[in-house]
Amino acid sequence: MLKELVKDSLTKRSIRKYDKLLNTKSSAYDKWQRQIEKKQVPAVEAPISYETGENGELIPNKLPVPKVKVVPYAKVWEINDAKGDEDVVYLFVSPKGKLTKRATEVVKQYFVAHPEHNVVYGDEDETGKGGKYIHPYFKPDWSPDSYLNAFYIGSFFACRSRILHESASEYDNAVRMLGGTGNKKNSPEQVGLEASLLSADVLFCMLAIHEHAFAKRTGTEFPIGHIKEVLFHRSPEQDVFYGRNFHNSRHMLIKPATVSIIIPSKDHPEVLKRCLESIVETTGDNSGITYDIAVVDNGSDAKNRVRYGVFIGKIPKKNGLTKINYIYKLEEFNFSAMCNKGAKNTHGEYLLFLNDDIECVKEGWLRELLSQAQLKHVGAVGAKLLYPDGDLIQHAGIANVMRGPVHKLQKMHDNKSHYFGYNRGIHNTIGVTGACLLISRQKYMDIGGFPEELKVAFNDVDFCYTLHEKGYYNVCCNHFYLRHYESLSRGLDTMDPRKMERLSAEGEILMRKHPNLYNVDPFYSPHLNEDETITAIIPRVDYTPVEDIPYANATIHEKGIRHSREDQCLRIGCEFNGTLDNWLYGSSAEGNDSGYYLKGYSFVIGSDNAIFERRLLLRLVERNEDGAGPVGPKVYSFPIYVGYRPDIRIRLQDQVNVDLTGYKVKIKKGLLPPGYYQVGMLASDKTSRLKLVNWVPNILRIRPSK
């Protein structure tokens, strides 16, 4: 009885401490935003332009600092500014909310600092109960295809007066682009079927057309600016999209087209058969598309080669299918080379690279992909992919964060909208998966095809990054889905230490090829969560810079963790383990002067996680052909910096108190002997003597100190 009372008391104490820490961390956004709003906006020195005088001399001309005039959305057509005063910036705002105190000054200084931009928008949030700032919408940089699907610009935008005047002639074009049919301002007819279109939406579209914002970029320079700061607090009753939300819609082709579908496949006859049959049955014969298919096989056994040939010969040539070409050659698996071989042996105007474990579900999917790929400014086009037999998302676009490229919304349910409609409609992303990737042959040739030095991983990402750097906008069509039987093509990389090592090596090649994209993704705000792939898209919730996290001291356990039990119920996710310099500056940073950094999450399945205290574990291992094994019982343990992880709570709604399951650990250079260390975790029950230990395949390399 006494033992139970003591345990109950300890449990309640642990939960109180947990709740107190959780309340502090979950209020971090409101606190962070209020701190920003108190800061003074730094003045920017106006740039100087030069004019050529009568005698050829250069005459300096300091650009004027503009005045900002705030205009409500309801009065956008009432501006009478025939001259287009160069010294004036118009800031258009929704009446449903308020600008921050800094907003006008931030906008003014932005235009001073960026003479190349004539139009800009920014981020916003919502005012909740008690005036608390909640639900921030951290928007992407200019995304033309996202904009045509939804008015993601939201509650405010600004432009130079001169551009407002010059864009007036684009009104009819803007209305047509947004789905309207009329040509009279302020009339119900002006928006046709899109009766909810806002006048401000039409005006913004006019400005974007004037700025050539629906054309291919010059490199990575964007034609419209984006201020990555919340400058507007929206009223809770106001829809952020003002009626034009991300939505499903049917698109028509610009003109009929030919498509070559390239499918790498080996020893998967039944899988490939399902894929081919689904393609034929869901591609309508009146879609304006004719297509051929190339199956590229790098080494199926004799029996499966026969099976391939038999069912390929039985696939009916209907609904636009002209032929299926089976290309066989025994060689090492190289996804890039197989894709390139397929492209060389086909002649379609467009190339669709498709995994053999893809199943097409509904008619119209190829038309939708092609309608985007036909746009001159669009590079690669992908589709939302769901896991089989359910609504779990496998892919909805790639985000490029500090730990590298990740799938957005992976393993989130598609039965509801996530983060302002990200899994709905059409979105510009920095990349899409090669499991389903459509591109024009000309653009494919322009970038030299797939990189054959990346044989297994990141080849599709490199392909998309190159397109982005060339100025194209990549697109993910999240208004429909295909099924992806992922991992049938090859084993999951996280299951084998050797595969993880290969994955890491190819990831380093990727970042060396694109050093300017380390932790840079114009379509995924730096204020959004950058943690594990199987999470929601949510605002970043820990605003403590990694530099401010203290270094952890090591406790040495010569004989291992005594009285502990190794148990798989202690789950560990290791999202980064490497040098702190690599984390901060990318894989090109070769030093280790700042020490080492590890981050991720861990939790105990089926238990109240508020009662557990966790410590990171490292043990020296020896690597061999079978992976890695411990060289002795010695274990090093480290206290962790507890991270707030609401994404884990969203994903694991059946688990108790998993909000604070994140961990971060910094280790000083020279603290550990050089070698390879396996990552693990210790979870100690604060209400009993229970100690749980588990290990993951992740290996941290400690380099010799120089």
Question: Where are the regions that the model predicts?
Answer:
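Conserved donor NDP-sugar-binding/catalytic core segment of glycosyltransferases
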Residues: 101-134, 162, 221-222, 358-403
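Glycine-rich, basic loop-to-helix element that forms the pyrophosphate-binding segment
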Residues: 75-84, 329-346
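Short aromatic/hydrophobic "clamp" motif used to bind/position activated sugar donors
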Residues: 90, 351
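Short, acidic, metal-binding catalytic loop of nucleotide-sugar glycosyltransferases
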Residues: 60-64, 113, 277-290
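A short, conserved alpha-helix in the catalytic core of glycosyltransferases
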Residues: 163, 176-222, 227, 366-369, ...
